Amino acid sequence: MFRLLSWSLGRGFLRAAGRRCRGCSARLLPGLAGGPGPEVQVPPSRVAPHGRGPGLLPLLAALAWFSRPAAAEEEEQQGADGAAAEDGADEAEAEIIQLLKRAKLSIMKDEPEEAELILHDALRLAYQTDNKKAITYTYDLMANLAFIRGQLENAEQLFKATMSYLLGGGMKQEDNAIIEISLKLASIYAAQNRQEFAVAGYEFCISTLEEKIEREKELAEDIMSVEEKANTHLLLGMCLDACARYLLFSKQPSQAQRMYEKALQISEEIQGERHPQTIVLMSDLATTLDAQGRFDEAYIYMQRASDLARQINHPELHMVLSNLAAVLMHRERYTQAKEIYQEALKQAKLKKDEISVQHIREELAELSKKSRPLTNSVKL
């Protein structure tokens, strides 16, 4: 009936990716740093099986790129690129950098096989020269690539290898980069129905960030910038959103509602009510209320989300409108629901979103069945 929208946090954390709620069986979550030692044997790639459940891969694709690679955070903090350039990096390091740039370009061009081959070359050269930063960064890129391709077992091993290197290099377990990897691992475990690990992963991410935020809230700006604090809050919002998604698909809408409420509050405070991802969270919160039969409350949030989506010409406007129509249908406002579905269909066609077009047409057919008996009874 509904399509959930994923949100992108500040600094491009997460690309929007809609997924359909009805019939989804995905369970979403991280083992912590343990796992493969540094010199991991990278498994051969395997194409993801088609039967993992509707809507799973769009979610994985969204999560996989919700931030820059975690290793990039470490690299940026220590000024690795700048230092290497100033010191006159040797030929091997320069070659690794070029390989990584080529790999990222291939990923952007949707050429995953080519990217994988290039990354293997970069990793081999990084090991030959014992360049630990390059090894870590390459593992992280390989993990993200495997993740978006649905190669969950490969991605798990590679994310753990990345985490092992980061922790071995002195990064703390509460660092945002570690939390980001943990969240990705969590989604892998959830998709594999490894529920104990999944739940533990979400709890680790959320509790660690909440404790971190509490400790850092009084720090002066010269010690920790406003932007750094905001990024940690936004990452918490991401974790709450992912956990809420897991709870909703696990048939726990009331618990999901509480998570979405917290995530929405964070997004409103930091990004504002008109931010595209704040609107996404309003829509998803409405979905959890609707799932509990609280149709009037759901309508309030969904109506507000759709109004804002129209004002800013939201890229997922057609999906928000489709969700609004679904709430109206549950409230037995069939005429209004039909009008909104038709508007959503028009927007979906303009976006050339064939999946949404098909979904909306199915909903219109279902609406027609529901409203026909009412029309007939009126005639009688």
Curated annotation (Swiss-Prot):
Posttranslational mods: Proteolytically cleaved by PARL.
Domain of life: Eukaryota
One family name in Pfam for this protein: TPR_12
Matching SUPFAM superfamilies: TPR-like (SSF48452)
Transit peptide residues according to the UniProt entry: 1-70
Subcellular location: Mitochondrion inner membrane
TPR-type repeats, residues: 136-169, 179-212, 237-270, 279-312, 318-351
Site (Cleavage): 71-72
Single GO cellular component term: mitochondrion
Keyword Transport: yes
Keyword entries, A-Z: Cell cycle, Cell division, Electron transport, Membrane, Mitochondrion, Mitochondrion inner membrane, Primary mitochondrial disease, Repeat, Respiratory chain, TPR repeat, Transit peptide, Transport
Recorded family membership: Belongs to the TTC19 family.
Subunit structure: Binds to the mature mitochondrial complex III dimer, after the incorporation of the Rieske protein UQCRFS1. Interacts with UQCRC1 and UQCRFS1. Interacts with ZFYVE26 and CHMP4B.
Role, per record: Required for the preservation of the structural and functional integrity of mitochondrial respiratory complex III by allowing the physiological turnover of the Rieske protein UQCRFS1. Involved in the clearance of UQCRFS1 N-terminal fragments, which are produced upon incorporation of UQCRFS1 into the complex III and whose presence is detrimental for its catalytic activity.
Protein's name in the database: Tetratricopeptide repeat protein 19, mitochondrial
Gene label: TTC19
